[in-house]
């Protein structure tokens, strides 16, 4: 049967284009790609490379793929944040602009469509955070695993030990049990946070073997330690809808300012806003940074003073220590009173205007001195990694070694909480896999 329309001869230019395409397709069919690490970035990279015709071997040292995905979002897996590209970039404080090509290739909207196209039901919650409808991270892992298998990828359990280089090109990976040769190698080993999931820094070792610079590692999205005794007395106290600022005491500048939830612990502070704040702290020298908490952000200073006056009037014959039942959580009363510096048994009707103003300022700027990060093993992600200037952002290929690619947490890019870090993994993995297949 003839096609509709007028038949014509192909032009010489069209014949050349078709010939080049056939050559590229034949080359892609025979191209071997080795992906090291079967986390979020590795699974996406492997499937992308396979979809573009490469023969893919995915190396994972754990018995099961996606171990770290399983614990993200408190076991629910915050798949991504369904925001626009510019919003995404603003939520990546470390080398966000490096990700423009990757995120435009696979946007958050594309990510949602990708998973739903594989049959995974998703839902969007507050702050555009996307989760599986089942609230089970295992469903995300199983969906990806089945997709990778259906794409024809070979998954092997082995531990990468050495990157094989020849004439300035990556030609394979020597593992504990076997050597795997390839035309392209993609390193997706993750960082050093949560080492029990297999993230033990193997990718940095392989990158160094290729001559890459590793930006010093530090924990990010991590709880903060404090030597303030108040924190220990308030451990377990969760504060919702509070303001949190991180102030650099050396420069006087506010490096972080947000609103949300936090938690006092025996070592200091944790919770969503605290984890995000940790991304903004660079030199964690003891005492350099203070956390300044606005306990009543919905009230202005004037409104809060009036509220205090009303409470004291209602409890005029009571001790001030018994007048905060409506204003503050029980665990916060004693620390506030101690800082306020007046006798606990002082009567409400004897509180002066100046004392009331001092209390107001204390509640609007409850300050906790930060002494350090919790260990990197407790961090959600690792800050630092392979220097971005040594990676081509349009392909994720090494600028130092041909045929070597990077994706995910091993790169010096990290973002805030809310699904942004997994999006980095999906987008860089997708771009690296596609590029490696060509």
Q: Residue locations for each model-derived region?
A:
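N-terminal Rossmann-like FAD-binding beta1-loop-alpha1 element of flavoenzymes
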Residues: 32-58, 432-437
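Short hydrophobic core segments
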Residues: 34-36, 160, 180-195, 208, ...
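An anion/pyrophosphate-binding glycine-rich loop and adjacent beta-alpha core
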Residues: 63-65, 70-71, 85-86, 121, ...
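Glycine-rich active-site loop/strand segments that organize a redox cofactor
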Residues: 76-124
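A conserved short coil-to-beta-strand element within the FAD-binding core of flavoproteins
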Residues: 156-169
